Amino acid sequence: MISMAGKAIRRWWALFALPTFAAFIIGFLVPFIMGVYLSFCEFTTVTDGEWMGLKNYTKALKDKEFLHALGFSTAFTIVTTIVINVIAFAIAYMLTKAIKGSTLFRSVFFMPNLIGGIILCYIWLLLLNGVLAHWGRALTYKASYGFWGLVILVCWQQIGYMMIIYIAGLQALPTDVLEAAAVDGANGRQTMFRIIIPLMMPSITVCSFLTVTNGFKLYDQNLALTNGAPSNMSEGLALNITRTFYGRMGWEGVGQAKAVLFFILVAVIALIQNKLTTSKEVAA
């Protein structure tokens, strides 16, 4: 029998869902549809768009700065995804062992994730420039300095968050399986690669998805740490799109086309990555 509260929820659920649904329509769906439409137009405001067909997409794909930003973001995402997940998993594995102070270490490793991105960037800007100053260099002296500076910053910020997810996964592992492996004579390497990692695929799927999408969406750290210097050589996709839209007169449509391409790219890569890791999760 359905309770009175259950009957009330069934009767009025639409009323409670309406504010969230309206916010989704107004805040996401309508701007998204308008953005896709304007990517095919030449415009200065959203009301004066003139249809241009695929011209904006052609200009975007021929823009050398955009292609360089694509390569920069791709390389950055590959490096940070590997580094963050490997280190976060290793730390999580160590902290799930019976070691003294493990709770304190978990808090310490997670703390960088609580600091705002812009503030964190300026802290690391001072630190990295202070080190490079010994050789008469600055973070914006070469694109490679900016690249590795961003890698260090983002890894330091996100490792703690991914560590928490891995710790939750490790603590949920069935102990009877691990005990059976030990009884059968499996060594540490065999236990890790044939039992623990396959069973950890749900956590690996989540963490790899987050690091891949965060890598491509990098903006505030890129803006504050290098601002694309030198000569836009350390500029990621998000920063390039923003500068195209707001900084190049008459290129608003091209900037919008870049944003649509960016959305498609991240969505496709995220779906492929999720499919690959999920298939291993099912097989495990």
Segment roles from a protein language model:
Residues 6-284:
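A structural signal for multi-pass alpha-helical bundles of membrane permease subunits
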Residues 1-4:
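Short, intrinsically disordered terminal tails adjacent to the first/last structured region
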